[in-house]
Amino acid sequence: MIRFILDTSIFVNPDVRKKFGNTPTEAMKTFLKYAEKLFGKVEFYMPPGIYKEVKNFLEDIPPEMELYIIKKPPNVHDIKIPAFVVYELIEDIRRRVDKGLRVAEKAVRESVIDTNNVDKIIQKLRRNYRKALREGIVDSTEDFELILLAKEIDGIIVSADVGILTWAEKMGIKWVDAFKFKELLDELVEKVESEKERK
C-alpha cells in the first residue's frame, strides 16, 4: 500500500495548486476525485494540525475529505530521531542566527546612511531576516508532525516546502515534490484502471 502524507502546499501554494484548481476548494475537490479512484490502493494522510490548516483555506468542506484523508497524529513518544539530526538542527540554527545578525547589521548601516527611507529599510530588513532564518528549515510544529508521521508509517511526504523536503531527505524519508504530484496521481490512476481491465 502506498501512503502519502500531504502538506498544505498542495492546496494553498498558488504555483502548485493551479494544477488541481484555481482556488484551494477547487484543488481539494479535484484531489478528492483522484483519491476516490485510488481508494483501497493508496492512502492519504494528514496530521491533524495540517488538516485543520487546510480546512481554514476551504470555502466549503467536501464531505469526502473525511473519507479519503486519514487524520493521524504521529506517535511522538515512540519515534526515535537520530542524534545527528539534532546536531545538524543546532548547527543550522546557529548559522541562521549569525546570518540574521548580518542582515540586521546591514540594515542599520543603510539606515544611518539613508535616514529618509527608514521604513523601506525596515521592510527590507524584515524580508531578508525572515528569509535568512526560516527558508529551508522546519519552522512549525505542523511541519515537524508531517515529517514524524512519514517516518512512523514509512510514508511519502508530498510538499513544496523546501524545509520539509530538506529535513525529510536528511532523515531518510521518501518524498515527492508537490509540483509533480498531479502527474504522479495521473500515472497511478492509469495503472490502477489498466489492472482492473486485465481482471
Swiss-Prot record:
GO MF annotations in UniProt: ribonuclease P activity
Catalytic reactions on record: Endonucleolytic cleavage of RNA, removing 5'-extranucleotides from tRNA precursor
Pfam families per UniProt: PIN_5 (PF08745)
E.C. number(s) listed in UniProt: 3.1.26.5
Keyword Transmembrane assigned: no
Metal-binding among keywords: no
InterPro entries: PIN-like_dom_sf (IPR029060), RNA_free_RNase_P (IPR014856)
Classification via CDD domains: PIN_VapC-like
Keyword vocabulary terms for this entry: Endonuclease, Hydrolase, Nuclease, tRNA processing
Annotated GO biological process: tRNA 5'-leader removal
Recorded family membership: Belongs to the HARP family.
Purpose: RNA-free RNase P that catalyzes the removal of the 5'-leader sequence from pre-tRNA to produce the mature 5'-terminus.
Name listed for the protein in its UniProt record: RNA-free ribonuclease P
Native source organism of the sequence: Pyrococcus furiosus (strain ATCC 43587 / DSM 3638 / JCM 8422 / Vc1)
